[in-house]
Amino acid sequence: FATNVILEDFINNLPEEELEHLAFIAPDNGAVGRRDVYLNSFNSTSIDREAGSFIKKRDYNNLVDGKYPVIEHLYSGNSDLTGYTAIVSDDMISSGGSMFDVMEELKKRNAKKIYLFVTYALFANGIDKFDEYYEKGMFDGIYTTNLSYIPEEYQQKPWLHVCDCSKVVAEIIYNTA
């Protein structure tokens, strides 16, 4: 249900010309379904749409902190995203490691703008690296919800848009009571 709230805020905050060429990106296999929901929300014939996804190539010979490290993000989709606004959608940002790799890969493919759509922005490693990437022009914004705690100081960042889901949650509670 956060999809509609995030989309509404996104559309209301962007100039119409930024919505003409959209590339919907899944940062991994688990996010393909979510990517497709966003892709199908823009069914207008006046919008040029692309879809892409990344596959995480892991080093299965080394276990680091209980995980097999990602050694490369392999991209499947249009290799030239010149002029496209890329929308990367996932359930959450935990540390942000994969998102940083995805941003770099999309910039190599000439994405004009990059926005991240996530239901939960946990920022487990803080936001310093997000500040750094924003200052370097690696992404243009993160759209997330208020369904997880986001410190007030983080909410003041120009790149962070916190979408209010309280009405939707209240409706769900009301309709199931």
Model-derived segments and spans:
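PRPP-associated nucleotide enzymes
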Residues: 1-177
